[in-house]
């Protein structure tokens, strides 16, 4: 069960969301919350939107996953401009983006799921940064324009010796995390 507290006054708001099994993601200028409910198998198969001050019965389902083997997760892009809805099982993933300022806007599907392909997405200044295992089991880092999210261009090739674990985007640079010969590595790289 999720409850909301006003940290400036210490007051608990009347909003109570029972059955949540996820983090709460603030959207729409902190007037809405995206969350997931647990289904009968204790999996998150949905992403829902709750407007503060409205009854929970009026919450809107933003996404529902029909495949019982997949779980739904939500988060924000590093710049907090995009709600990132991901659905995945142990070997396959699919990501949709929704403007965080307008969570009722139609979602943008980055790439339709393909069995065995896992990917995650972040966005900076109209460019998507995609960590994916579509061309190499140790993942690659690709980019794509937000307006054409399926057109991936490799930025860092997949490698037998370097396992890409993650990428974090910042204003002036990005950080690549990985393993080289079993040792953790962090690389700071600049855009352009």
Language model segments and positions:
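Peripheral, non-catalytic segments that deliver or gate enzyme domains
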Residues: 1-192
């Amino acid at each position: 069960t999720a409850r909301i507290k006003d940290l400036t006054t210490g007051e608990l708001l009347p909003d109570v969301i029972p059955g949540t099994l996820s983090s709460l993601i603030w959207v729409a200028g902190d007037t809405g919350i995206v969350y997931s409910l647990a289904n009968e198998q204790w999996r998150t198969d949905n992403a829902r939107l709750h407007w503060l001050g409205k009854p929970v019965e009026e919450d809107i389902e933003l996404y529902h996953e029909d495949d019982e083997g997949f779980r739904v997760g939500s988060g924000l892009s590093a710049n907090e401009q995009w709600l990132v809805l991901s659905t995945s099982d142990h070997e396959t993933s699919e990501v949709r983006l929704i403007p965080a300022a307008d969570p009722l806007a139609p979602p943008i599907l980055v790439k339709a799921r393909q069995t065995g392909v896992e990917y995650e997405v972040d966005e900076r200044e109209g460019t998507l940064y995609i960590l994916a295992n579509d061309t190499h089991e140790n993942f690659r880092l690709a980019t794509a324009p937000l307006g054409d999210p399926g057109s991936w261009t490799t930025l860092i090739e997949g490698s037998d010796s370097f396992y890409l674990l993650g990428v974090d985007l910042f204003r002036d640079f990005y950080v690549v995390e990985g393993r080289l010969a079993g040792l953790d590595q962090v690389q700071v790289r600049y855009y352009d």
